[in-house]
Amino acid sequence: MDINEKVLLLAILKKESNESLNDIVLKLENTGMFSLKEGKKLLKKLKTEQFISDSFLTLKGDAIAKNVEQEFKI
């Protein structure tokens, strides 16, 4: 899993209840993390790999996102 995927999963974990996945991608695009096209491609990949379902993390996605959070705290 590359750094962009990790950051996106963490951002989804930390998203506000009124934010959509597209809002998260747009925020990360504004920071220069990746382009909108790349962000949407990453979302699709994470959905295909069953890290995301609808607008939420799956149990698998949640576990990975929490590991990423710990990784970034170091």
Annotate each language-model stretch with its function.
Residues 2-31:
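Short amphipathic alpha-helical interface segments
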Residues 18-19, 34, 52, 74:
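A general structural signal for well-ordered secondary-structure junctions
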Residues 19-23, 37-38, 56:
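Alpha-helix N-cap and coil->helix boundary residues
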Residues 31-48:
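Short amphipathic alpha-helical interaction segments
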Residues 47-56:
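A short, conserved structural fragment
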Residues 57-62:
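Residue-level signal for threonine
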Residues 63-74:
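Short, amphipathic alpha-helical interaction segments positioned at domain boundaries
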